Design a protein with these regions (language model features):
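Long, internal low-complexity/basic segments
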Residues: 22-27, 34, 39, 63, ...
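Active-site segment of extracytoplasmic enzymes that catalyze sulfate/phosphate-ester chemistry
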Residues: 31, 38-113, 117-123, 464
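A short beta-strand-to-alpha-helix junction
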Residues: 47-51, 69-73, 103-111, 222-237, ...
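Polar, surface-exposed loop/tail segments
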Residues: 52, 81, 130, 136-139, ...
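C-terminal cap/loop subdomain of S1 sulfatases and analogous C-terminal strand-loop tails that border
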Residues: 310, 317-422
Length: 501
């Protein structure tokens, strides 16, 4: 009997040791998610900024030059990332949706998000950044490390807010999957130049920048472009502090680091719009030397969809990518995307429907709502009208210039009538100012890109094609000032309410 007990005890100790050994061999995964930032870092060729920490990280990993977001606004993009799936497939395409009990959006039965897959494979998970997903979920299902107060306050209907948790909170020997928000282009204030100067960084001035042709060369545009460049250096400071903490805690050689933005900058034609400037994002993946496949100092120019961050994180930690996900592993030997797709639907107070496909050279955009202009008094312009001294004040200046006839044809286009199709040659026209959709010399390219987009829409069962329910409109009306709601759908909704008995 004593022999059996001793044998059992020995086997138990051995099993625990093996389990701990396997756990220790697993690498941590850290997502550093930048808000609203285009790839204007020095590693991407911008000579006006210095980003030494990001540059060093890229030198230890892989830099992707053609990564594009699923959506040009945060919550659909983040919903696609956390699910590894196209937002229009799951119905998570409208910005800040599923925030009321009456308008809950549920993922398919038995669908697992990325944090849930990590947890099932022995990881601790946390999200200290944005909790901004357009579907119903319980935070404690996704994240094992969190503040119970945050769970009670934010999880019930998947509302937007800041998460909680840190790798220092982990008491077990398990590896971690962590999400950390980096302020990027969103938290930009007048104090930023002083911060940069005190930190030994240059300060980009309005007089130094070049204004792209889609915008008028006015001080307000120069200032905002300069401040976005300064935000890039603020990002470098924040990431540098995180990397220093990893080094201090002995985690640098145990952690795969992903650095990327949810979408591009917040310039007028960037955020919320499916132009390249709103979709193109930085992407760096850095891993310990012991991990095969991630070769230090590599630069890749192939097309990458940002949702592939999810599949890559799973694959690099030897986890299977669920068949329910659209994401892929960018380091798979057979990885290749002929096209990258994106969508823009309701962004805050404005309803639209735009679909986009980026190919090796051309970018095709399909506009469905031709009864409204591109710049349709979105929330940034309404902020400028209601609060002229806000950082979005230059939106009001642009509209004033349009009304006074001071914008050229290219600059005035977003205020005028929409065209159903747009086609741009990214090689010769990176700022997308010449629409080739009606150019007979580009019929073949138009047909190719049109067909690719149609195939994606059909394959995903695009939920953005369906009419919005009254409940989804009520959800918006309850939190946004009525005078901001200028889309025809809201006008019709208000008319129905007034005419109801």
């Amino acid at each position: 009997m004593k022999y059996l007990q001793s044998t059992f005890a020995l086997l138990t100790i051995l099993a625990v040791s093996i389990a701990q050994g396997n756990t220790e061999k697993k690498l941590n995964v850290l997502w550093l998610i930048i808000d609203d930032q285009s790839p204007w870092h020095s590693i991407y060729g911008n000579d006006l900024v210095k980003t030494p920490h990001i540059d060093k990280l890229a030198s230890r990993g892989v830099l992707f030059t053609r990564a594009y977001s699923e959506s040009p606004v945060c919550s659909p993009s983040r919903s696609a990332l956390i699910t590894g799936s196209h937002a229009i497939r799951l119905g998570t395409h409208d910005h800040r949706s599923s925030r009321t009990k009456e308008n809950q959006i549920f993922l398919p039965e038995n669908f697992k998000t990325a944090p849930e897959v990590f947890r099932e494979n022995g990881y601790e998970t946390y999200n200290s950044g944005k909790d901004d997903y357009n579907f119903f979920y319980k935070k404690s299902d996704l994240y094992s490390i969190m503040d119970s107060k945050v769970e009670n306050k934010l999880a019930k209907y998947g509302k937007s807010g800041q998460g909680s948790g840190d790798w220092s909170d982990i008491k077990s020997q398990k590896p971690f999957f962590g999400q950390v928000r980096v302020s990027g282009g969103k938290d930009v204030g007048d104090q930023l130049p002083d911060l940069l100067a005190k930190s030994g960084y240059p300060v980009v001035k309005a007089s130094q920048v070049t204004v792209p042709p889609q915008y008028p060369d006015i001080y307000e545009m120069r200032y905002n472009i300069a401040m976005h460049m300064n935000s890039v250096m603020q990002t470098d400071i924040e990431i540098g502090k995180i990397l220093s903490r990893l080094e201090r805690d002995g985690l640098t050689d145990k952690t795969i680091i992903f650095v990327f933005a949810d979408h591009g900058s917040d310039l007028p034609r960037s955020k919320e719009f499916c132009y390249i400037e709103g979709l193109h994002v930085p992407l760096i993946i850095s891993a310990p030397e012991s991990l095969e496949g991630v070769e230090s100092g590599t630069v890749r120019d192939d097309l990458v969809s940002l949702i592939d961050v999810t599949g890559t994180a799973l694959a690099l930690t030897n986890q299977d990518i669920p068949e329910s996900m659209d994401t892929r592993n960018v380091f798979d030997k057979n990885y290749k995307r002929e096209y990258v797709f994106s969508a823009s639907d309701r962004s805050a107070n404005v309803i639209d429907r735009v679909r986009s496909v980026v190919g090796k050279r051309y970018h095709y955009i399909k506009n469905y709502k031709l009864d409204r202009p591109l710049f349709n008094y979105g929330h940034r312009e309404m902020m400028a009208i209601d609060y002229p001294d806000s950082k979005y004040g230059y939106f009001a200046k642009l509209r004033s210039m349009y009304e006074d006839g001071l914008l050229n044809e290219i600059q005035a286009t977003p205020f005028g009538d929409r065209t159903a199709e747009e086609l741009y040659d990214l090689q010769n026209d990176p700022n997308e100012t010449v629409n080739l959709a009606s150019d007979k010399n580009h019929i073949a390219e138009l047909i190719e890109m049109r067909g690719a987009l149609a195939g994606w829409i059909e394959e995903t069962g695009d939920k953005g094609a369906f009419k919005r329910s009254s409940k989804s409109l009520v959800e918006v009306v309850q939190r946004i000032p009525p005078h901001w709601l200028k889309s025809p759908e809201f006008r019709d909704f208000f008319d129905e309410i007034q005419s109801a008995p």
